[in-house]
């Protein structure tokens, strides 16, 4: 649309506003898709909105997806991207939607536990924080969700977990410790 410039290299897309670029930070956008689907057109609309509202560049890792890959591979792919963004831009906030929100939360917990430089904030939109799909309330919500179905999500969660237990906090951050995490906003 002419408002942005973008580069793509080694599975990392970087999108910049053509005008009004603010200094002092960047966003990393982790897309949703149940850890099995790539970005879709609507998610590019989210990226546009983030740039329009913040004036910051957005870095979009095309992280490895299940069932061909596992969460561990995605962690190994995204963590260096965070490090590089911090070195280049200083302040880094991760915006994750759905599965990307669960991934963002897991990455922040891992950085905390490894005493690595933490991101400056998390914005989580409807984060998928429990891939076990065992919460009894799911049956109440299921009829209202016309797209996502419990059996398919449970399969995706198991595929994403790989050799890890789906209830492991790195896979389902709901079971992790939130103490010491960066400031976060959660939208449902």
Set out the residue ranges of the language-model regions.
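Alpha/beta-hydrolase superfamily serine-hydrolase fold, recognizing
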Residues: 7-12, 16-188
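An N-terminal hydrophobic leader/cap segment in hydrolases
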Residues: 1-7
């Amino acid at each position: 649309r002419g408002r942005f410039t973008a580069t793509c290299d080694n599975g990392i897309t970087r999108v910049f506003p053509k005008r009004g670029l603010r200094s002092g930070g960047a966003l990393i956008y982790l897309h949703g898709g149940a850890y099995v689907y790539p970005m879709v057109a609507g998610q590019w609309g989210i990226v546009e909105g983030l740039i329009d509202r913040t004036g910051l560049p957005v870095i979009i890792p095309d992280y490895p997806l299940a069932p061909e890959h596992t969460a561990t591979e995605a962690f190994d792919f995204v963590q260096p991207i965070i490090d590089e963004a911090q070195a280049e831009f200083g302040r880094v906030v991760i915006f994750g939607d759905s599965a990307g929100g669960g991934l963002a939360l897991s990455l922040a917990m891992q950085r905390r536990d490894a005493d690595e430089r933490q991101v400056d904030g998390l914005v989580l939109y409807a984060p998928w924080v429990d891939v076990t799909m065992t919460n009894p309330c799911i049956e109440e919500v299921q009829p209202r969700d016309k797209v996502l179905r419990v059996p398919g999500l449970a399969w995706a969660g198991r595929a994403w977990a790989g050799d890890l237990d789906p209830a492991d906090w790195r896979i389902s951050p709901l079971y992790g410790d939130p103490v010491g995490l960066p400031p976060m906003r959660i939208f449902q």
